């Protein structure tokens, strides 16, 4: 079934210029809808973990997400006295109290998650935004005004602090999703974008910005890397000298490995997850 779906999506992607809500084969519409429904239920995901820092990205699923915009017209979405006009409905629209209780998710108004995102049991959405294709795993808190971009992958027991931004893949078009692995703490107003991977048990301090071109300097080893924060790192914003010391440029600095003191200041509060 999965291989058949992939073949349909890949073929439709090659012919995407000819697709529209009124001009798409039923087979393509059904395949795209099936993928979105499976993403919404957490049965499919854009990327799957093979080990620490090791991920397989399923490009055909990302293509299905993009095709879904090609196959839908905008429609009126109402929420009380508010009105919206979009192609993607919200994730929890029309659910009863019993159905919401069964998800094990707490959603604080006016948090928004789009259909096609998955929010696992024990997760908390403060007034925040989770885009289509994103995966938020168990026990994670998405704090106030944080944004989980399209197809971003967030692990178990992660804390995304207020105003954190995780980049998406839809616009500008990115090859790989942004990934935050299990037990990470992302400090307020930090931005992780462009498919950067933050490996498990890491702590990103407040106001750190990391994209694929951001130097990540490890002061313990005096090395620079890009696109990946090693497991168990504590990262702050800083700069590195350039041009024979004439100027400096922004960098993310790994100042140490996570220790007991770090954990005590970034631990999750179980009282908030009852």
Swiss-Prot record:
Pathway connected to this protein: Amino-acid biosynthesis; L-lysine biosynthesis via DAP pathway; LL-2,6-diaminopimelate from (S)-tetrahydrodipicolinate (succinylase route): step 1/3
Pfam families listed in its UniProt record: Hexapep_2 (PF14602), THDPS_N_2 (PF14805)
Compartments, record wording: Cytoplasm
CDD domains: LbH_THP_succinylT
InterPro entries (UniProt xref): DapD_Trfase_Hexpep_rpt_fam (IPR005664), Hexapep (IPR001451), Hexapep_transf_CS (IPR018357), THP_succinylTrfase_dom1 (IPR023180), THP_succinylTrfase_N_sf (IPR037133), Trimer_LpxA-like_sf (IPR011004)
Signal peptide: none
Residues forming coiled coils: none
Predominant location: cytoplasm
Listed GO CC annotations: cytoplasm
A GO molecular-function descriptor: nucleotidyltransferase activity
Catalysis performed (reactions): (S)-2,3,4,5-tetrahydrodipicolinate + succinyl-CoA + H2O = (S)-2-succinylamino-6-oxoheptanedioate + CoA
Binding sites annotated in the UniProt record for substrate: 106, 143
Domain of life where this protein originates: Bacteria
This protein's UniProt keywords: Acyltransferase, Amino-acid biosynthesis, Cytoplasm, Diaminopimelate biosynthesis, Lysine biosynthesis, Repeat, Transferase
Membrane-crossing residue ranges in chain numbering: none
Gene Ontology BP annotations: diaminopimelate biosynthetic process; lysine biosynthetic process via diaminopimelate
Similarity comment: Belongs to the transferase hexapeptide repeat family.
HAMAP family hit by this protein: DapD
Protein name per Swiss-Prot or TrEMBL: 2,3,4,5-tetrahydropyridine-2,6-dicarboxylate N-succinyltransferase
Source organism: Paracidovorax citrulli (strain AAC00-1) (Acidovorax citrulli)
